[in-house]
Design a protein with these regions (language model features):
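Conserved Rossmann-fold NAD(P)-dependent oxidoreductase catalytic core, especially the SDR/UDP-sugar
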Residues: 10, 14-70, 74, 78-82, ...
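Conserved Rossmann-fold cofactor-binding substructure of NAD(P)-dependent oxidoreductases
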Residues: 1-7
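Strand-loop microenvironment adjacent to phosphate/nucleotide-handling motifs in alpha/beta enzyme folds
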Residues: 74, 78-198
Length: 198
């Protein structure tokens, strides 16, 4: 009890787009399997809040890295719904970080500002939300804190099915057949599309 964490920020990921397109199995094993491990452990040890750091383009994925981040988001969202249903103690959130200055000057968010806003997200909401920090929003997003944080409520309620699909994908990832792996990720994402925001 003394060493049980209250907050977990899961930011480990492979985010190099071309590298992940070349090594799709690594995108799956790190970005998806790693997230499954962290989410499961956060629930097991009754962490109060888990925040997964995702990618801005996971909303509409176009490459292996973005698909792997969206599949990981789906797993976190379904885990949060299961925990709510089973009266679990852990709330899970997703933060999609936009490009951070100086790598992207049209965004106008610094690294320290991105960190501060991510910490703020860690104490907001009821779980299951996707927060877009420092990235471009669209008409479907509710403004939460001025222009810097947007919220998207996207519920994925079928944990058992999601877990089965995701674990099968991770198992297939050891074959290293890129086209098959991309196809399997694309198959998972449309099954659990983004719902309308609230």
């Amino acid at each position: 009890e003394e060493t049980r964490p209250q907050l977990v920020f899961h930011s480990a990921a492979y985010k190099h787009v071309q590298l992940m397109d070349d090594f799709v199995s690594e995108a799956i094993q790190t970005n998806i399997s790693g997230t499954v491990n962290i989410a499961d452990l956060a629930a097991k040890y009754r962490v109060s809040r888990m925040v997964m750091i995702s990618a801005a383009n996971a909303r509409h994925p176009e490459n292996a890295m973005e698909y792997s981040k969206r599949v990981a988001e789906i797993y976190v969202q379904s885990s949060d719904c299961r925990l709510k249903r089973d009266k679990g103690e852990t709330d899970m959130f997703i933060v999609r970080l936009g490009e951070v200055y100086p790598t992207n000057t049209h965004c106008l968010i610094t690294l320290s500002e991105a960190c501060m806003l991510t910490l703020e997200v860690g104490v907001m909401g009821d779980g299951g939300e996707v927060y877009i920090v420092g990235g471009p929003g669209d008409g479907l997003l509710d403004s939460v804190i001025g222009e810097k944080i947007k919220r998207e409520k996207a519920s994925v309620d079928d944990y058992e099915h999601v877990r089965e699909e995701v674990l099968a994908l991770v198992q297939h990832s050891y074959t290293e057949k890129k086209a098959i792996l991309i196809g399997l990720m694309k198959k998972i994402v449309p099954i659990f599309p983004l719902s309308s925001t609230q």
